[in-house]
């Protein structure tokens, strides 16, 4: 298997990663306002494609649709319309998250999309740095991580969601759904949701793969040893992690990551089935 994805991450990439994260929040806010709503909020996510991180199609009230694409190789967010027109907002100009989102809002307005945007989702006045070479390298991470997640996802049958990049966390993941149902109160209403297990990559700080069962049944899980240095996580949030640097540059890294995901599911499955 190719080892490209598992090349070591450089801590000097963080300013550019943080910029991409800030700009993705603006993209996500536009998708939230205009995409066809999905009950699991999948409409606000981005999908990994060879040419970037792409929104769902955003319907234009007068007809047609628009999509936004974060082009990490071309260093811009491209706004493409079904009528053949396109525009872009460069990510290299040092704009704050607020300024960048406002530029995107103006661009989609020119395509016929106007609405009320949740500005708290993207307002950020931090000056932004952007290194094109780092952005290209990070795109490679997303593309190859997407492949690994899709390989795992393909083994799990029909009860899975798509692989998605989430603007709020700038992580990449999918979810598998069990048959156990959990009830809890939200907004004064009792809702039922299926138990679930995610699998993803968080690329910030000390980057890590994660796989988190919900509900997390510590008594059943914490005594199970995970492979390849992976460990259960109980501080701050509950789940499991396999740190990226534990497998980086290892020729067997992809296999080890997939074995980690399988081991978590094997341990958690009895707790997720009704």
Language-model features: where?
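Aromatic/basic-lined ligand-recognition segments
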Residues: 127-203, 208
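Secondary-structure boundary elements
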Residues: 106-117, 144-159, 218, 269-272
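N-terminal ordered "arm"
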Residues: 2-65
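Low-complexity, glycine/alanine/valine/leucine- and proline-rich hydrophobic stretches
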Residues: 193-240
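Glycine-rich, often proline-containing surface loops adjacent to acidic residues and nearby aromatics
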Residues: 75-89, 118-133, 235-246
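Long, hydrophobic/aromatic-enriched structural stretches that serve as scaffold segments
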Residues: 46-120
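TerminUS-proximal long segments
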Residues: 235-274
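Ser/Thr/Asn(+Pro)-rich, low-complexity disordered segments
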Residues: 60-69, 99, 232-234, 240-248, ...
């Amino acid at each position: 298997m190719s080892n490209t994805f598992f090349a070591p991450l450089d801590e000097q990439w963080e300013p550019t990663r943080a910029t991409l994260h800030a700009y993705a929040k603006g993209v996500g806010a536009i998708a939230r306002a205009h995409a066809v709503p999905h009950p699991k909020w999948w409409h606000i996510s981005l999908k990994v494609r060879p040419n970037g991180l792409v929104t769902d199609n955003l319907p234009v009230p007068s007809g047609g649709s628009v999509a936004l694409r974060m082009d990490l190789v071309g260093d811009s967010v491209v706004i493409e319309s079904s009528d053949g027109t396109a525009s872009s907002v460069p990510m290299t100009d040092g704009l704050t998250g607020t300024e960048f989102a406002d530029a995107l809002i103006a661009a989609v307005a020119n395509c016929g999309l106007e609405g009320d945007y949740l500005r708290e989702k993207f307002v950020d006045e931090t000056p932004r740095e952007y290194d094109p070479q780092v952005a290209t390298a990070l795109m490679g991470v997303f593309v190859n991580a997407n492949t690994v997640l899709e390989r795992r996802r393909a083994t799990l049958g029909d009860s899975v969601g798509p692989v998605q990049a989430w603007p709020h966390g700038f992580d990449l993941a999918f979810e598998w759904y069990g048959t156990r149902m959990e009830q809890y109160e939200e907004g004064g209403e009792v809702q039922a949701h299926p138990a679930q297990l995610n699998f993803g990559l968080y690329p910030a700080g000390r980057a890590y793969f994660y796989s988190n069962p919900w509900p997390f049944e510590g008594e059943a899980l914490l005594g199970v040893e995970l492979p390849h240095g992976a460990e259960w996580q109980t501080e701050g949030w509950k789940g499991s992690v396999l740190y990226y640097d534990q497998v980086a540059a290892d020729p067997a890294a992809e296999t080890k990551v997939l074995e980690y995901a399988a081991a978590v599911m094997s341990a958690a499955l009895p707790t997720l089935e009704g």
